[in-house]
Amino acid sequence: MSLELWLSLFVICLLGAMSPGPSLATVTKHTLAGGRINGLAAAWAHSIGIGFYAFITVTGLAVVLHKSEALFSTISLCGAGYLAYLGYKSLTATDGIASTLEKGEAVSIKQSAKEGLLISLLSPKIALFFIALFSQFVAVGESAGAKVTVVMTPLIVDGLWYTFITLVLSSPIFLERLRNKGKLIDQISGVVLIALAIRVVWQNAEYL
């Protein structure tokens, strides 16, 4: 995998992790309710779920691409529609990323890890996002090393982002800064997701 392609993957994974949603709300709840350790437990358990989705998506898409290019393109186009929808939602969001930062009830570290894992494994949004995203980074004949990179990148990026969130929530100064930049994060995410959707449609125009 080229550096340019990996950087594209990295940026999309980062924006995906930064997108406000139930995952952020869950990690936030456990951080504010149980402290830094609970937040980290939820964050990295969540990233393991992300890694699992990445693995099965890479494997499944590789098989589909090998057997049917038309079917793969259809999946890609459906994914493009979903990416465009996510981008639109981000651009039209009335509140920024900080709107999900709410306090929850105290829970054990084990419960924090469990909820962090389940919120990623049971989210249709995450499954659809990976189908849309990985259609751009999976290719027939891709080396095992490249596939490992594709799987590990979202896992590590997700874990590090929510680790950052956990640490930020321990500092009122940085929390306020994040609140102030929340709308900007939404807008950047929206533009990038819509741009990626347009790219997918362009690459699969012959099947329209």
PLM-predicted stretches and their roles:
Residues 170-175:
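Short, flexible, glycine-rich and Lys/Arg-enriched loop motifs at helix boundaries
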